């Protein structure tokens, strides 16, 4: 057990510092913005320092563990810890949240509440990734939903209340299944009920019970990931949310579902996961081609990017379902990779909206000459999204492909069929991404409109774009930077399976 509460400080600091902002006298929007940015930078530096000096990459066990009795009556503990599976997502959360708050500089209405909600969401997300207690994981999972709902309903487009209501109905409804799974898995014990994830990982269950628990957790995580057909909240939410909120949704929130699938479904319920993995493989494959074929029909810019996120999440599901070392490593790399790519694309879509106040691709055109910096960055990040060699998406998808090929669980014809359908999806991806760029930046529609003034990317926007792009290129050139963090944990998880 760790004697200094590093993780507790990292989890509690953002929401605590954000709460102070609500009670301090109003000093103007700029003060609140810079205060929030300083909090995020300090949090990111503290997280990086803690992990650099206290995390051992060759140890697959839980590190920096903290275990404090919280509620005696319920035998409830505040258990935190990290391993190779969670360290990457925690660092991703810190990086994307800092960029999202910097991107939210134009927000002036209810600035104090807006930035407090962003910080509360930050704490909930880090708490979910570092929880080593099932009930604490559930509480953090729910804590993160409240700020998202308020951010959607108060700052967004004309249909923001509809999209916020749809979001909360889907996620709150799925949380019921998560709670049932948490109670079921914790109450069944050989000696006494436990919520400790480390102890639960070494526990076996009757096959029927394991299947029931697996389905409950799967529904909860399938909504958040999202998996088809439980994805319909995502395009509406992204289409109406402020682009800084979209950055957090695409960059972090979707990854929580994939993280839960690995942390709970795959690690705690290996027999059920082995039984359900072929179905997950089918769903992931269909998801890639479904989203890639549906996306070109979306006339709303942000909805089209949202469908690209659905397609990319299909690769993560396939990697998890492959039950192989390369497949799971590729899925983890894709989680980090798409976190940066998705957040960056939504940011650039938002900066375009700030200039022209349009989201319909049919009304756009001809912006490349007036805003060459934004055009260049959007083109590069579109290439990253379609998995151009040299970018992180290419490496992640290639490793997932390799994981399918080397899997001993599936027959040769099944693997050939899966790879063939995935390849079709990858061919469709450039069609909807490049056509999106063509509709936005080429042609003469907006150039011929009078009283339209364009201004190119400013220093803040250019810094945000470059900050998102550099990790994408870095992981594309040297993916071992991410893979080395999780490799030992992946081997530990796969040791519960008889093939791989």
Swiss-Prot record:
Transmembrane segments: 4-24, 35-55, 87-107, 113-130, 134-154, 167-187, 211-231, 242-262, 272-292, 305-325, 330-350, 386-406, 416-436, 466-486
Any one cellular-component term (Gene Ontology): chloroplast thylakoid membrane
Record field: catalytic activity: a plastoquinone + NADH + (n+1) H(+)(in) = a plastoquinol + NAD(+) + n H(+)(out); a plastoquinone + NADPH + (n+1) H(+)(in) = a plastoquinol + NADP(+) + n H(+)(out)
Enzyme's top EC category: translocase
Keyword Amino-acid biosynthesis annotated: no
UniProt keywords, alphabetically: Chloroplast, Membrane, NAD, NADP, Plastid, Plastoquinone, Quinone, Thylakoid, Translocase, Transmembrane, Transmembrane helix
EC number(s) stated in the UniProt entry for this protein: 7.1.1.-
Keyword Methyltransferase belongs to the record: no
UniProt-listed Pfam families: Proton_antipo_M
GO biological process, one term: electron transport coupled proton transport
Chief place of localization: plastid
MF terms in GO: NADH dehydrogenase (ubiquinone) activity; ubiquinone binding
Subcellular localization, as worded in the UniProt entry: Plastid, Chloroplast thylakoid membrane
Ranges in a coiled coil: none
Domain of life, source organism: Eukaryota
Membrane topology: Multi-pass membrane protein
PANTHER family named among the record's database cross-references: NAD(P)H-QUINONE OXIDOREDUCTASE CHAIN 4, CHLOROPLASTIC, NADH-UBIQUINONE OXIDOREDUCTASE CHAIN 4
Family according to the record: Belongs to the complex I subunit 4 family.
Annotated protein name in UniProt: NAD(P)H-quinone oxidoreductase chain 4, chloroplastic
Gene responsible for this protein: ndhD
């Amino acid at each position: 057990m760790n004697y200094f509460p590093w993780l507790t400080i990292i989890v509690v600091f953002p929401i605590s510092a954000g709460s102070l902002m609500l009670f301090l006298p109003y000093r103007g929007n700029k003060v609140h913005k810079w205060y929030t940015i300083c909090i995020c930078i300090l949090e990111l530096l503290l997280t990086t320092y803690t992990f650099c000096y206290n995390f051992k990459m060759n140890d697959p066990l839980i590190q920096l563990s903290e275990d404090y009795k919280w509620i005696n009556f319920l035998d409830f503990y505040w258990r935190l810890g990290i391993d190779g599976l969670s360290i990457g997502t925690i660092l991703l959360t810190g990086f994307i949240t800092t960029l999202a708050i910097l991107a939210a500089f134009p927000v002036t209405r209810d600035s104090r509440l807006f930035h407090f909600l962003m910080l509360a969401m930050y704490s909930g997300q880090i708490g979910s990734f570092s929880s080593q207690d099932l009930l604490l994981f559930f509480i953090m999972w729910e804590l993160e939903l409240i700020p998202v709902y308020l951010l959607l309903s108060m700052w967004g487009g004309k249909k923001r209340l509809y999209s916020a209501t749809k979001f909360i109905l889907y996620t709150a409804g799925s949380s019921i299944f998560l709670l049932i799974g948490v109670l079921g898995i914790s109450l069944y014990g050989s000696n006494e009920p436990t919520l400790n994830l480390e102890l639960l990982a070494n526990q076996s269950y009757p096959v029927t019970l394991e299947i029931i628990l697996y389905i409950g957790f799967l529904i909860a995580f399938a909504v958040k990931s999202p998996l088809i057909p439980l994805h319909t909240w995502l395009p509406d939410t992204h289409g109406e949310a402020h682009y800084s909120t979209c950055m957090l949704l695409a960059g972090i929130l979707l990854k929580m579902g994939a993280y839960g699938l690995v942390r709970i479904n795959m690690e705690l319920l290996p027999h059920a996961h082995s039984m359900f993995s072929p179905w997950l493989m089918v769903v992931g494959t269909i998801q890639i081609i479904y989203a890639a074929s549906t996306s070109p029909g979306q006339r709303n810019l942000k909805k089209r990017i949202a469908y690209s996120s659905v397609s990319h999440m299909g690769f993560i599901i396939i990697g998890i379902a492959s039950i192989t070392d390369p497949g799971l490593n590729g899925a983890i790399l894709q989680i980090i990779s798409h976190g940066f790519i998705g957040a960056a694309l939504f940011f650039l879509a938002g900066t375009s909206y700030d200039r022209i106040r349009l989201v319909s691709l049919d009304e756009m055109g001809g912006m490349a000459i007036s805003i060459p910096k934004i055009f260049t960055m959007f083109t590069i990040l579109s290439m990253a999204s379609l998995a151009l060699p040299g970018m992180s998406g290419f490496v992640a998808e290639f490793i997932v492909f390799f994981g399918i090929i080397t899997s001993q669980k599936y027959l040769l014809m099944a693997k050939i069929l899966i790879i063939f359908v995935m390849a079709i999806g990858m061919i469709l991806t450039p069609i909807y991404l490049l056509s999106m760029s063509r509709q936005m930046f080429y042609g003469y529609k907006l150039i011929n409109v009078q009283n339209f003034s364009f201004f190119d990317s400013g220093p803040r926007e250019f810094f945000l774009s470059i900050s998102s792009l550099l990790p994408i290129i870095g992981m594309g050139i040297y993916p071992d930077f991410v893979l080395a963090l999780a490799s030992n944990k992946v081997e530990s998880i796969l040791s519960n399976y008889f093939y791989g």
